[in-house]
Curated annotation (Swiss-Prot):
Its EC number is 3.4.21.88. Keywords: Autocatalytic cleavage, DNA damage, DNA repair, DNA replication, DNA-binding, Hydrolase, Repressor, SOS response, Transcription, Transcription regulation. It comes from Lactobacillus delbrueckii subsp. bulgaricus (strain ATCC 11842 / DSM 20081 / BCRC 10696 / JCM 1002 / NBRC 13953 / NCIMB 11778 / NCTC 12712 / WDCM 00102 / Lb 14). This is LexA repressor. Transmembrane segments: none annotated. The lineage of its organism: Bacteria, Bacillati, Bacillota, Bacilli, Lactobacillales.
Length: 206
């Protein structure tokens, strides 16, 4: 049994290393070659057992969708990174940004390869509902000061207030566009980008 456990941990470690190095998990054949197994069915068996142990999540609809859970990281002796939750950001009527860390949130394994500095902000309002960002959601943000047109960003307005909007640089101004047909864009001569939204966490599902 110990041999099976060690082989499973070897497979888990290889999946982790591959995602860290290239950003996506290996194929079953790559796992075979890496851990010295000749049968893909044997690897599938190990992956199923890792899933039963709660170390791995597989998506049956995607051939290479393997995600290591926090329990899996613990089994490998890897401490998950934590994302600081910083104040509240408004999607709708902006409010003053609060640059205080309120809490820490475990880094989702699918963002483990993100090289940037991440933080989270809680969204209040409905201005981004067409983009699937709802009131009370937490946006995961990569800290950066630039953005491409059409990207969803956290931006600071001229009044020193933070808001989540879709970013557009136009000829004479910047446009922070809501994803809600009932709301108007914010037009600014100057804008400070705090970061790009790279993920979303929802605590309540209605």
């Amino acid at each position: 049994m110990a041999t099976h456990d060690s082989k499973q941990l070897e497979i888990l470690q290889y999946i982790y290393d591959t995602v860290e190095n290239r950003g996506f998990p290996p194929t079953v054949r790559e796992i075979c070659a890496a851990v010295g197994l000749s049968s893909t069915s044997t690897v599938h068996g190990h992956l199923t057992r890792l899933e039963r142990k709660g170390y791995l999540i597989k998506d049956a609809t995607k051939p290479r969708a393997l995600e290591i859970t926090h329990a899996g990281l613990d089994a490998l002796g890897i401490k998950p990174k934590d994302i600081p939750v910083i104040g509240v950001v408004t999607a709708g009527q902006p409010i003053l940004a609060v640059q205080d860390v309120e809490d820490y949130f475990p880094l989702p394994p699918n963002l483990a390869s993100d090289a940037g500095e991440l933080f989270m902000l809680r969204v209040h309002g409905t201005s981004m509902i067409n983009a699937g960002i709802l009131n009370g959601d937490y946006v995961i943000v990569r800290k950066q000061t630039t953005a491409q047109n059409g990207e969803i960003v956290v931006a600071m307005t001229d009044d020193g207030e933070a808001t989540v909007k879709r970013f557009f640089k136009e000829d004479l101004h910047y446009r922070l566009q809501p994803e809600n047909d009932a709301m108007d864009p914010i037009i600014l001569n100057h804008v400070q980008i705090l970061g790009k939204v790279v993920g979303l966490y929802r605590t309540n599902i209605d």
